[in-house]
């Protein structure tokens, strides 16, 4: 990747405008922010034909340039997908206000009261893949949580992104929220210079390749939220219901293989490997999945041999690595060695084994008897997500509204001074009050 350039005067001016708008947005009340989102949704709906046409232009150009089928699938924004995205904006508008929530209320002394309340982060800098519905998701979450946003999408989606941003700003213009709260970056140089906007941007959220995320983490002083890989695993335990295991594994891989929560490695307990693979191999073959396995799984019918590189690969396509393991402990060891702490699943009817798996695997999501494709902010009831974080510190997993706020301590007194408590003239009471 290129070296990070200094921000241009024009970028500094635009970022400053977003910052100023974000201050006002953070003080907007719940109703004003809800109304702003409804106006954004209305503007998108009114311009739906133009948005789909802009996306078709991006699709045609990208197909002629040889963009991979998996990336073309992400790039596509047809009428149905757009309708779903618009519905998502309205759902975010209806979510409970994340701001002004008090989770601590304490009397430190008579007339000296402390509270901790949620407030916006400020300005988000979001760099995302060629997926134009991401612009809609991120913008809606930013406005609902009181944050401004600088957004940079993949160049493959430039026509769609520009048309979507124009619609979103038109919606905001008819609301109490300034259109300046959102800005679209359009060049590679701007996305690189974004990394030097500390003081104007409070959090960077990268969504894209491992290389992109690593580069951003290594080249900015701004906090970064995101994940570098989505190497997800499904483990078929000795006590698995094999029909259930085939169904869950198939969905986890094929429901949307380009997603970061699709499985890339299938681990199978040795005692059920023959019976499970005899059913799973034809099912995956019929779904167009290429299987690559270790020696034990190849001996049981997996058609291609895997190398160690396969255990580290996020295919984002219809390819799946398969490995036979001796037991749950061996499966857990493999996941710890090669996983990215995104999402893992165990299929078993043994409750104790499930509990061991759920408590021993340090991933953002650990599942029992269900598809890894549920690792999604919308499916969790968050309305939408800005991304998935695999970091240990919060927010972790799918990041929705709750992950886009911080908190502020407010202390109200009446001439209280610390010297009185240091001398013993006054004493703290530290009485918790009702929230």
From Swiss-Prot:
Alphabetically ordered keywords of this record: Amino-acid biosynthesis, Cytoplasm, NADP, Oxidoreductase, Proline biosynthesis
Top-level class of the enzyme under EC nomenclature: oxidoreductase
One matching Pfam family: Aldedh
One of the record's GO cellular component terms: cytoplasm
Keyword Oxidoreductase listed: yes
Domain of life: Bacteria
SUPFAM superfamilies recorded: ALDH-like
Pathway connected to this protein: Amino-acid biosynthesis; L-proline biosynthesis; L-glutamate 5-semialdehyde from L-glutamate: step 2/2
Transmembrane annotation, as ranges: none
Main location: cytoplasm
The enzyme's E.C. designation: 1.2.1.41
Listed CDD domains: ALDH_F18-19_ProA-GPR
GO BP annotation list: L-proline biosynthetic process
Compartments where located: Cytoplasm
Catalytic activity: L-glutamate 5-semialdehyde + phosphate + NADP(+) = L-glutamyl 5-phosphate + NADPH + H(+)
Database matches in InterPro entries: Ald_DH/histidinol_DH, Ald_DH_C, Ald_DH_N, Aldehyde_DH_dom, G-glutamylP_reductase_CS, Glu-5-SA_DH, GPR_dom
Molecular function terms, GO-annotated: glutamate-5-semialdehyde dehydrogenase activity; NADP binding
PROSITE patterns: PROA
Family note: Belongs to the gamma-glutamyl phosphate reductase family.
Database matches in HAMAP family: ProA
Function statement: Catalyzes the NADPH-dependent reduction of L-glutamate 5-phosphate into L-glutamate 5-semialdehyde and phosphate. The product spontaneously undergoes cyclization to form 1-pyrroline-5-carboxylate.
Protein name: Gamma-glutamyl phosphate reductase
Organism name: Synechococcus sp. (strain WH7803)
Gene assigned in the entry: proA
């Amino acid at each position: 990747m290129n070296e990070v350039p200094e921000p241009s005067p024009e970028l500094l001016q635009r970022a400053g405008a977003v910052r100023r708008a974000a201050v006002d947005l953070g003080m907007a009340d719940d109703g004003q922010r809800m109304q702003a989102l409804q106006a954004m949704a209305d503007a998108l709906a009114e311009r739906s034909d133009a948005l789909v046409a802009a996306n078709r232009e991006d699709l045609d150009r990208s197909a002629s340039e040889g963009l991979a089928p998996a990336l073309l699938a992400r790039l596509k924004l047809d009428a149905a997908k757009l309708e779903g995205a618009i519905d998502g904006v309205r759902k975010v508008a209806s979510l409970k206000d994340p701001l002004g929530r008090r989770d601590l209320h304490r009397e430190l002394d008579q007339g000296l009261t402390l509270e901790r309340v949620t407030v916006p982060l400020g300005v988000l800098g979001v760099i995302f893949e060629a997926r134009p519905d991401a612009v809609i998701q991120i913008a809606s979450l930013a406005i609902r949580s009181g944050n401004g946003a600088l957004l940079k999408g993949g160049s493959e989606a430039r026509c769609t992104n520009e048309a979507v941003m124009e619609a979103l700003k038109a919606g905001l213009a008819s609301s109490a929220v300034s259109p300046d709260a959102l800005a679209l970056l359009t060049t590679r140089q701007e996305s690189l210079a974004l990394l030097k906007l500390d003081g104007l941007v409070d959090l960077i959220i990268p969504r894209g390749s491992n290389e992109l995320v690593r580069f951003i983490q290594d080249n900015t002083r701004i906090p970064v939220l995101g994940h570098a890989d989505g190497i997800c695993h499904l483990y078929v335990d000795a006590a698995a219901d094999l029909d259930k295991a085939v169904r869950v594994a198939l969905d986890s891989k094929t429901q949307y293989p380009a997603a970061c929560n699709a499985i890339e490695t299938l681990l199978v307990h040795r005692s059920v490997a023959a019976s499970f693979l005899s059913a799973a191999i034809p099912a995956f073959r019929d779904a167009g999945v290429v299987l690559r396995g270790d020696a034990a799984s190849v001996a049981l019918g997996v058609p291609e041999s895997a190398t160690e590189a396969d255990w580290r690969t996020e295919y984002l396509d219809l390819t799946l690595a398969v490995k036979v393991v001796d037991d749950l402990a061996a499966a857990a060891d493999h996941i710890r060695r090669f996983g990215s702490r995104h999402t893992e699943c165990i299929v078993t009817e043994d409750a104790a084994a499930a509990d061991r798996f759920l408590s021993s695997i340090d991933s953002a999501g650990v599942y029992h008897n269900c598809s890894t494709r549920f690792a999604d902010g919308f499916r969790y009831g968050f309305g939408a997500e800005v991304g998935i974080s695999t970091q240990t510190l919060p927010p972790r997993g799918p990041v929705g509204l709750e992950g886009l706020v911080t908190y502020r301590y407010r202390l109200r007194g009446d001439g209280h001074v610390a010297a009185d408590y240091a001398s013993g003239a006054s004493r703290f009471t530290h009485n918790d009050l009702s929230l």
